[in-house]
Amino acid sequence: MTLEKGNIIKRIKKNERDEFSNTVANSELTYKVIRVNTKTYGLECIGGYMKGTKCNLIKGFKEKSADVYGTVTEWILV
């Protein structure tokens, strides 16, 4: 997925295990792309528990991935 300045994307995390039911392993964050560099995208969180924070996302990010605990993370373009 290639992003441009002004795009809105969502990061959706899901984990079906009971011990993760009330944690950030089951969360949804909405970001706005505020900067595009040669290697990263600059993001500002505009919705969710991290609203108002900024971060960088590497350009080669995986649109869908899973970790060792079974949490599936998916990035979607809104």
Stretches found by the model and what they are:
Residues 18-59:
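Basic/aromatic-rich interaction segments and small domains that mediate binding to polyanionic partners
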Residues 2, 6, 26, 47-48, ...:
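Disordered, low-complexity tails and leader-like regions
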Residues 13-14, 39, 63, 77:
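Intrinsic disorder/low-complexity segments
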Residues 1-4, 76-78:
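Short intrinsically disordered terminal tails
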Residues 46-78:
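Intrinsically disordered, low-complexity, charged/polar segments
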Residues 2-23:
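Short coil-to-beta transition motif at edge beta-strands of beta-rich domains
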Residues 12, 33, 61-65:
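Assembly/interface hotspot detector across virion components, adhesins/toxins, and nucleic-acid enzymes
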Residues 7-10, 30-34, 42, 74-76:
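Ordered hydrophobic segments in well-structured contexts
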